[in-house]
């Protein structure tokens, strides 16, 4: 069986279910509805929105709920697909990149953010958002909230501020996995999908990303490694898993295209990480 196929994704979900994990959306977690052990499935729909409908259908068949974050670009923002995913019982949110789109102009960015939020609220009462990494841009989209407050726009949660933050990780021992770079240990290719806050552990300053890596990413490279890790660690209480659905397909041609494109992107991202 090849990695990053829908069949493999189904096996990953099955391992989580067999491990006794409760599946909830990020919105539900923000509302205080989590019961441990739990996993939040987060999907960043960067491209190929149709692939997200495929994963959403598999999840619905298995009685699993997930959260899908859509960009405003045409490759992601496809109303019929968004509506179908909502009908399947999943949460959707805005995968915002406004600060990058407006080259750091915060007033223009927040105006654009507000308009796009209104757009997505046609399909779902969007209450959570998540930044798009925009790896080529020099602007971090999260910096918009240095000037503004997303709570003023009816938003109750943003994963990097409210879930994947140092204090929450320290208290709740949260683990974080992402398929960035088309692997589960792709930190060296990761520009922004990481945890940067600092923790004090045994009087030493370490990054919370280092903590999650030491706890989870040892020997976890492929999805099959991930499944084995889940089967070997039944005591995990809190976990967020981020996937990019465009990477997951049973179509051989699309699978090969994604494999080649990701190889090229990884080389470029590795250069960006070194420069920054």
Where are these regions (language model features)?
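Terminal accessory/targeting
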Residues: 1-42, 46-67, 76-77, 86-88, ...
């Amino acid at each position: 069986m090849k990695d990053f196929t829908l069949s493999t994704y189904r096996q990953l979900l099955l391992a989580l279910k067999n491990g006794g994990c409760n599946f909830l959306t990020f919105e539900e977690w923000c509302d205080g509805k989590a019961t441990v052990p739990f996993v939040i499935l987060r999907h960043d729909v960067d491209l190929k929105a149709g692939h997200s409908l495929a994963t959403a259908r598999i999840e619905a068949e298995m009685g699993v709920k997930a959260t899908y974050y859509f960009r405003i670009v045409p490759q992601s923002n496809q109303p019929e697909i968004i509506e179908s995913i909502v009908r399947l019982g999943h949460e959707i949110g805005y995968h915002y990149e406004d600060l990058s789109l407006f080259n750091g102009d915060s007033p223009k960015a927040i105006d654009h953010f507000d308009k796009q939020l209104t757009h997505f609220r046609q399909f779902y009462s969007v209450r959570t958002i998540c930044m798009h990494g925009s790896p080529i841009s020099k602007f971090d989209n999260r910096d918009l909230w240095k000037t503004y407050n997303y709570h003023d726009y009816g938003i109750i949660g943003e994963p990097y501020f409210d879930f994947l933050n140092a204090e929450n990780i320290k208290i709740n021992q949260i683990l974080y996995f992402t398929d960035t770079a088309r692997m589960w240990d792709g930190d060296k290719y990761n520009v922004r999908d990481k945890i940067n806050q600092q923790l004090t552990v045994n009087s030493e300053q370490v990054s919370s990303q280092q903590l999650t890596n030491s706890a989870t990413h040892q020997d976890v490279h492929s999805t099959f490694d991930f499944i084995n890790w889940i089967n070997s660690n039944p005591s995990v209480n809190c976990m967020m898993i981020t996937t990019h659905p465009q990477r997951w397909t049973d179509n051989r041609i699309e699978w090969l295209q994604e494999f080649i494109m990701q190889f090229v992107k990884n080389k470029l991202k590795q250069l960006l990480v070194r420069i920054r």
